[in-house]
């Protein structure tokens, strides 16, 4: 529907998806676009660094672009982005080259809008179940750290040169969210 707004010289009349680095992420963007009948071309640039450079350049020039990344990611802490949403997540074990890229009969974009991935705080279950660690366990159960906050902290560390500790302290000083985590 909006392909003309995302078309470039290299994609002609098709819209452009800045595709994921195929070798590292194994996402098969063009196959997914074709299965869904989306008239876009996946332009795969080889690395995450190249993907981000292309996206940042488009953003800086105020050119429309389409890409996807996980969250939290520093790109979202650095740039104001708009999510477009994807079809509901559905597992699709047959979306493989060996199975000729079948779409499981779903008619949807396999393995997209991935199921929510919750950051887990790794700990020894036996240790955390012991009575002397009850407060620590209560803390981790209450902890909810927004992706947007994490993305901004990633920018402060990666671009602005803060240490992780400094970025955390800055966040703590400007937010009261963490106080609700305390037992």
Model features per residue range: what roles?
Residues 11, 42-45, 67, 152-156, ...:
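Surface-exposed patches in mature extracellular/periplasmic domains of secreted proteins
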Residues 3-6, 32-33, 172:
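Hydrophobic, Leu/Ile/Phe/Ala-enriched alpha-helical segments that form helix-helix packing faces
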Residues 22:
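Glycine-rich anion/phosphate-binding loop at the beta-strand->alpha-helix junction
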Residues 1-18:
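A conserved helix-loop-strand patch within extracytoplasmic ligand-binding domains
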Residues 127-128, 137-183:
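C-terminal functional modules
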Residues 17-18, 28, 32-37, 41-151:
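Flexible, solvent-exposed loop/hinge segments that line or gate ligand/substrate-binding clefts
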